[in-house]
Amino acid sequence: MDYRNFFTGRPTSEICRDLIGRPFYYQAGGEKIGGYIVESEAYLGIYDRAAHSYGGRRSQANEGLWRAGGTIYIYSQRQYVFFDIACQEEGNPQGVLIRAIEPVWGLDQMLKNRGGKDGVLLTNGPAKLMQAMGIKSRNWDLAPLADSPFVIDLTEKKPAKEIVASPRIGIVQADPAWAQAPLRYYVAGNPYVSGMKKRDWADDHGWL
């Protein structure tokens, strides 16, 4: 996969939106575990008050954002880990967070990894999808996506009827402009989108 070109050369918000409907999976011992991306968020670097690199912050913890586009940036909060990918050229610390997937491959293993939690609870959030894939550490942080067991299949894209742009989730410490910036993208009506109310679920999960 030509991840370097995919994750550079255009606005990070556009890259983030283009990830919707792409297969995202983890290859574990020959087994494929994952599904279609249904929700993602863009973070726009040193001027984005919600970004880990805001103001030019650079540390061992967020170094992945500063690397070349297509580099994995895994960060942790408490016991949870989150999967991001650096966008833009090295030194321009922007990135996208994969927030949710609709599970397709390795469902039995996902159920085990999530302690039996099934249905939308399986992968309807960024920490949940990492748990479902069996990822518990930052071991693959800083690795090029192409050299890792994670795959985003750029040759396939499940078409969504509508992709919604909305404010990012949990951004309360930023100034209002950044807190309300429409940098979260999701498939309208897909039950695996984090926080999607049951009354808004579509029978076809929002796919064409």
From Swiss-Prot:
InterPro entries the UniProt entry points to: Formyl_transferase-like_C_sf, MPG, MPG_sf
Broad EC category: hydrolase
Classification via Pfam families: Pur_DNA_glyco
Gene Ontology molecular function, alphabetical: alkylbase DNA N-glycosylase activity; DNA binding
Domain of life of the source: Bacteria
Keyword Hydrolase recorded: yes
Keywords: DNA damage, DNA repair, Hydrolase
Positions of transmembrane segments: none
A Gene Ontology biological process term: base-excision repair
Gene3D superfamilies named among the record's database cross-references: Methylpurine-DNA glycosylase (MPG)
Keyword DNA repair applies: yes
EC number: 3.2.2.-
Family recorded in the similarity comment: Belongs to the DNA glycosylase MPG family.
NCBIfam families, per database record: 3mg (TIGR00567)
HAMAP family assigned: 3MGH
UniProt protein name: Putative 3-methyladenine DNA glycosylase
